[in-house]
Amino acid sequence: MCDDEETTALVCDNGSGLVKAGFAGDDAPRAVFPSIVGRPRHQGVMVGMGQKDSYVGDEAQSKRGILTLKYPIEHGIITNWDDMEKIWHHTFYNELRVAPEEHPTLLTEAPLNPKANREKMTQIMFETFNVPAMYVAIQAVLSLYASGRTTGIVLDAGDGVTHNVPVYEGYALPHAIMRLDLAGRDLTDYLMKILTERGYSFVTTAEREIVRDIKEKLCYVALDFENEMATAASSSSLEKSYELPDGQVITIGNERFRCPETLFQPSFIGMESAGIHETAYNSIMKCDIDIRKDLYANNVLSGGTTMYPGIADRMQKEITALAPSTMKIKIIAPPERKYSVWIGGSILASLSTFQQMWISKQEYDEAGPSIVHRKCF
């Protein structure tokens, strides 16, 4: 099926923060752009400028100074379908430059998403974009495919949602899935807040993007939070400077590790929830006693929010403290984990055994959107 570019399947990982899209069988996504739709805040005065009423992705990012930026996907759930359609349209026609009606399309979603969300996704794919076939896969399961395992527990932390999914011999264990609506975007908001304490004010949607960049470039996870706070208070060795787009230079110190510490202590942002190390442990404890050993030995990290330096060591330390003392614990943090969901999708969609799993246009016409629950796990 994948010999020719004509009928290659498309893989589109719609994250809350980034869309990763490309062709099945490739080893990396061709298009990676922010899931943003921007609309002008001001009246257009120059005629013939070809101004649009909305901008998508990188174009919205580059004109962000005059736009209001909105993310149509919040916490992994699509909240604005009109904007989402714009993003898909942009993905197919501008980024990949393909006609969706010629390619089967694999989409991804977070586990424990509302059922209506997948149905509407299915409906738009078949009715608006006329795809010949489609499938909706769970993100964390794809990450496991990408790491070459069939057993393990995935911690998938993106921009909108973090979840732990234990998979045993290729089966996800739905009763043990843990979902935490705390992820990259919440960390960005928290960083905006604690930078205000230093006297740097960031308020607009465009300035939030600057803070996101600061977060991605300078934040790290401390192995021991209290010690690190003491070090930061007594010396300036942890301080780093960052140049804003207008040339101002700001200095940040303990904010560098206070921001991602929220993942381990959600009470920092007022969330009454266990940290990611505890949800991972709780998820393993909900699984059958016989398979826990294999899960402890295969903790796979995936998603952009697991890209902080030091996060793997910290997870190792925290889970070791919770688990039985004789247990062997291994955290797997592949360097390409930012895209591992997409890579897993690319692997899945190009398997010969997967070809009968697609939902075809014909099946959709017969059964309607609810077919997605029967055919996609």
Curated annotation (Swiss-Prot):
It comes from the Eukaryota. The modification Methionine (R)-sulfoxide is found at M46, M49. The modification N-acetylaspartate is found at D3. One of its GO terms (cellular component) is cytoplasm. Oxidation of Met-46 and Met-49 by MICALs (MICAL1, MICAL2 or MICAL3) to form methionine sulfoxide promotes actin filament depolymerization. MICAL1 and MICAL2 produce the (R)-S-oxide form. The (R)-S-oxide form is reverted by MSRB1 and MSRB2, which promotes actin repolymerization. Pfam families: Actin. Its EC number is 3.6.4.-. The modification N6-methyllysine is found at K86. It is found in: Cytoplasm, Cytoskeleton. GO terms for molecular function: ATP binding; hydrolase activity. CDD domains: ASKHA_NBD_actin. Keywords: Acetylation, ATP-binding, Cytoplasm, Cytoskeleton, Hydrolase, Methylation, Muscle protein, Nucleotide-binding, Oxidation. Actins are highly conserved proteins that are involved in various types of cell motility and are ubiquitously expressed in all eukaryotic cells. This is Actin, alpha skeletal muscle. The lineage of its organism: Eukaryota, Metazoa, Chordata, Craniata, Vertebrata.
